[in-house]
Amino acid sequence: MIVIENILGQDVLTEVAAALRELRWEDGRNTAGATARRVKRNQQADLSSRTGSKVREVLLEAVKRHPVVEAYARPLKFAPPLISCSGEGDAYGLHIDNPVMGKGDARLRTDLSFTLFLSPPESYDGGELEIETVFKTESVKLPAGSMVIYPSTELHRVTPVTSGERFVFVGWIQSAIKDAAQRAILFDVTNLKAGLARRFPPGSPELLTLAKTESNLIRMWSDI
């Protein structure tokens, strides 16, 4: 799991907040799997309108182009993302995301899930994203514009919202590196390369060797 801060700037957040008020909303259970449908209680934005499509494009592009998302997730495909709103009394009980999403050529395996927070945490009470890891339950409630990426293999829930409204942008990633341990190794290598680039000149033997190692690991492990 990783938290990435400031995916969105304040100008974008303000524009998105205004656009969300123009969208049509429907029962969030319409897109839930059979198990999750029983415990899901929220509203989901209809993104088929021009405004909805624009908001989705802006948010998804911000996620895709962030260098930490690329280094950590190694995205191959993104499932169609959602925007959800949880008002007073809404919650999403403990569930697991669908292992496969989409149809036909658009089908993908869900390796990683992400939640990009669109509401300031002080604007609502409750609404924590709780992720059940092997060792403990991680509780996540981030500033607007920040996001969390976590394994789709983990059970998770959204606690009841007791006041205010919680808006989030939610999506799923199929990674080019299927194995989570291999992704973690590559993330370490990428961070090491960035650190050494501040100490060694471009084209140095150290950086070239590390770049070769990173490339060959990707070549060996990529599931493409």
Curated annotation (Swiss-Prot):
SMART domains in the record: P4Hc
Keyword Plastid attributed: no
GO biological process, one term: intracellular iron ion homeostasis
EC numbers for this chain: 1.14.11.-
Cofactor binding note: Binds 1 Fe(2+) ion per subunit.
Cofactor: Fe(2+); L-ascorbate
All copies of domain Fe2OG dioxygenase, residue ranges: 77-175
Top EC class of this enzyme: oxidoreductase
GO MF terms held by the record: 2-oxoglutarate-dependent dioxygenase activity; iron ion binding; L-ascorbic acid binding
UniProt key word Metal-binding: yes
Keywords: Dioxygenase, Iron, Metal-binding, Oxidoreductase, Vitamin C
PROSITE patterns found in the cross-reference section: FE2OG_OXY (PS51471)
Name of the molecule in the record: PKHD-type hydroxylase HNE_1625
Provenance organism: Hyphomonas neptunium (strain ATCC 15444)
